[in-house]
């Protein structure tokens, strides 16, 4: 029963898979090639296994603080790299844009480390939490959270990070590590850059997965409300921008960055949220809402006609 007393019945749920072939010029067609998987599984990911690069021959010169840092590296060495690799694979399944953005961020952070090593500057290491690894970045860091910052020189990003040190950053002198750390960083960076060069610049017009979503919204369900779930805010924001650019009206995205995602739920589903709308106020209604799991629990979205899981990891039970 709705808040106004009107009764309703839930429609029968019909799961319809949406298959699409990759267009010949779609960069995603190259991303699902074995070459991509070989690089992902072949990367050393040294920033997430720093314990293996500690120069233990110099242990007698370590300060008490450095001994504690090394102990932390040793405790964290087992799972961090595996989580990062898994996250990259999940981003690949989400879409080419999110995947290439993660690769670019990874390169940028490697370059920041290399800049520090080559200039004898302290390395910004941090606490790695599972929640960070499963979020939009392989590690949530202020240096390259903003997509625009990816084009900054490593020296600029290093200076910005040094001037605004997050609480989770621990600065470590480069002499604490062996030369192999630099070699591994260079090897991973070169391998990723080769992939990015192969893919070329991301072009929305060649994104066949996006094209299939547009077809579903415009042709298959032109008059229906469409709710799209994705695990990543990068994908959500990308899709919202691409749909608007294509000319689809009344589109928005809800992510963890929104201060009040409930307002987006109300705009998308005003009928089922009528009790939350002040008397006499109108609602700028949405037809298409793209959301991360920020709206997966505790929100009324019953005005939706079509629910799309853009990437597989979304949990239907939520």
Q: Predicted regions: what is each one?
A:
Residues 227-229, 290, 308:
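Structural motif
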Residues 257-258, 293-318:
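Conserved RecA-like helicase motor core of SF1/SF2 enzymes
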Residues 223-224, 246-250, 284-286, 302-306, ...:
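Short glycine-/polar-rich loops that comprise or flank the Walker A/P-loop
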Residues 236-240, 278-279, 283, 290-304:
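SF2 helicase motor core recognition
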Residues 1-259, 294:
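Helicase motor interdomain insertion/brace
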Residues 252-292:
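Conserved helicase ATPase core of P-loop NTP-dependent helicases/translocases
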Residues 218-221, 245, 270, 274-283, ...:
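Conserved catalytic network of the ASCE P-loop NTPase/AAA+ motor domain
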